[in-house]
Amino acid sequence: MIVVNANLLVQYYVRGTHTAVAEAVLSRDAQWIAPMLWRSEFRNALILLVRRRLVPLEDAVVVAHEAERLMAGHEHIVVAHRVLRLAADSGCSAYDCEYVALAEDLDVPLVTSDRQVVRAFPSVALTPERFLAA
């Protein structure tokens, strides 16, 4: 079981230079979990791609449904005080710290391409490449 952030989900579902790595992460550990926040972040990333004309709106809707199916039953609520403490101590956003808090609470790795999170939380956050090499 691993915590994944919305960026990794976007990399998995939207074909691009990082898709193969995201697919390898899923092959290595298919039990992906995330805080409930992932949905909003994922949708926001998709609409940004739509606005840049990189993904048609219809495709974004399909991708959103596919991601929701993958993550169904694997979404967790994290408590505010943990998230806020992590954000205050690290300088990372509260959004990012939702993923960190979940990973720490469940004692599982957080796989993310967010270098700031990896630097701030080296004991729990791994890049996809480092996760695959471990």
Name each model feature, range by range.
Residues 39-43, 80, 117-118:
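Alpha-helix N-cap/helix-start and coil->helix boundary motif
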Residues 43-71, 82:
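Active-site-proximal, substrate-binding regions of enzyme catalytic domains
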Residues 48-49, 86, 102, 120:
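Residues within well-ordered alpha helices
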Residues 1, 92, 100-134:
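Acidic, PIN/NYN-like endoribonuclease modules and their adjacent C-terminal/linker elements
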Residues 7, 41, 98-101, 116:
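Active-site phosphate/pyrophosphate-handling residues
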Residues 69-113:
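Active-site neighborhoods of divalent-metal-dependent phosphate/nucleic-acid chemistry enzymes
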Residues 1-37, 49-58, 116, 134:
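Short, well-structured N-terminal submotif of metal-dependent ribonuclease cores
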